[in-house]
Amino acid sequence: MKVSSAEFVTSGTRPAHYPPPELPEVAFAGRSNVGKSSLINVLVNRKGLVRTSSTPGRTQLINFFRVNGSLMLVDLPGYGFAKVPLAVKKEWGPMVETYLSTRPNLSCVVLIVDIRREPTEEDQLMLQWLRAYNVAVLVVVTKCDKVSKNERAKQAAIITRTLGLARDEMAFFSALSKEGRDEVWARIEVMLAAGQEEAEESGE
């Protein structure tokens, strides 16, 4: 996808705060500090559109970004960081679950995992939950520049086995080299087209 414009729209914690559900939305989910913000920034060619932080758990709101005036990218709060206060964790779960289960214009979810780490139980539960709700999912494996080719192949096998993935449900990505940018966009566009076709067939 050629990105001509990308802009921050709003942040929120509940549906009343979200933009009107007029544009298709692609949500980005994953553990804290897995490279979500960097992935979005590279996809839209805007280095500072989404703030990156070395402090896991920093993103505590659902953030909306409009791309080309025709698509919304949605940055969901990261999960699984032990030092985040329990009270905040309790708010995050319902907030994210409500968004994912009730947002009518959600087209697909990009689930992000770090190639240097085995998928956690939370990653597995998130994927199972999305599948149960029939949400289209692409798993993006980030930080691929941090490992050798042999290690990448080894970790890819672990990730596909642990998450029960087919190879075409996964894409490799590096924010440093921008490897995988075009493939991730291509996969997203396929899921968007499928979602549009499904919506037309159902008369929505």
From Swiss-Prot:
Key word Coiled coil present: no
CDD domains listed in its UniProt record: YihA_EngB
Pfam families to which the protein is assigned, alphabetical: MMR_HSR1
Cellular component annotations (GO), alphabetically ordered: cytosol
Highest taxon listed in the record's lineage: Bacteria
Binding site for Mg(2+): 37, 59
Any GO MF annotation of the entry: metal ion binding
Domain named EngB-type G: residues: 22-194
Keyword Zinc-finger: no
Keywords, in A-Z order: Cell cycle, Cell division, GTP-binding, Magnesium, Metal-binding, Nucleotide-binding, Septation
One GO biological process term: division septum assembly
Region annotated Disordered, chain positions: 1-21
Chain sites annotated for binding GTP: 30-37, 57-61, 75-78, 142-145, 173-175
Segments crossing the lipid bilayer: none
Cofactor: Mg(2+)
Function: Necessary for normal cell division and for the maintenance of normal septation.
Family: Belongs to the TRAFAC class TrmE-Era-EngA-EngB-Septin-like GTPase superfamily. EngB GTPase family.
Listed name of the protein: Probable GTP-binding protein EngB
Source organism phylogeny: Bacteria, Pseudomonadati, Thermodesulfobacteriota, Desulfuromonadia, Geobacterales
